[in-house]
């Protein structure tokens, strides 16, 4: 994990790709975020989070370059249960993802250009949808792709069907 993270930033530096790595205070620890600023007149700000086993850095390859070329600022973020938060601080996922997003937005007040887009990949789609349902003022628009609507349904695809009734009855 640490090697992949270190090599990612070495790669950005070697390619002279500007970025700002920022620690955002949250509860009794901090969340890593990564800010990329477009060189164009900004059309808005994209807030992107990944899913269950996502690393903050892997989100660069799915969205950042294209978004910057299209004129958007990009803020990648992780929350409890992801990346460093789980590996270093042993912080599990929270059902209150709206509080995670609020902390990120608060920390980036000066950099945000509206409209604000919340983008969630995989389980991140569920997290962004949940945050937006709990606080409709977080984002102007929400984009969910490779959406992961239900952890249990996903789990069930990997176990024999004979065991499915036990999952429904919660043993």
Question: Model-predicted segments: where are they?
Answer:
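Conserved alpha/beta-hydrolase
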Residues: 67-85
């Amino acid at each position: 994990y640490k090697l992949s993270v270190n090599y990612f930033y070495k790669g950005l530096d070697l390619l002279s790709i500007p970025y700002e790595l920022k620690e955002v205070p949250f509860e009794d620890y901090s969340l890593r975020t990564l800010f990329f600023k477009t060189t164009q007149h900004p059309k808005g700000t994209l807030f992107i989070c990944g899913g269950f086993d996502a690393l903050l850095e892997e989100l660069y390859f799915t969205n950042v370059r294209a978004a910057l070329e299209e004129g958007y600022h990009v803020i990648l973020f992780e929350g409890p249960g992801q990346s460093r938060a789980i590996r270093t601080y042993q912080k599990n996922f929270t059902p209150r993802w709206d509080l995670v997003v609020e902390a990120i937005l608060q920390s980036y007040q000066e950099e945000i250009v509206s409209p604000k887009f919340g983008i969630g990949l995989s389980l991140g789609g569920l997290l962004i949808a949940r945050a937006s349902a709990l606080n409709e003022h977080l984002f102007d628009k929400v984009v969910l792709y490779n959406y992961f609507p239900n952890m249990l349904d996903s789990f069930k695809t990997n176990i024999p069907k004979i065991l499915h009734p036990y999952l429904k009855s919660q043993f």
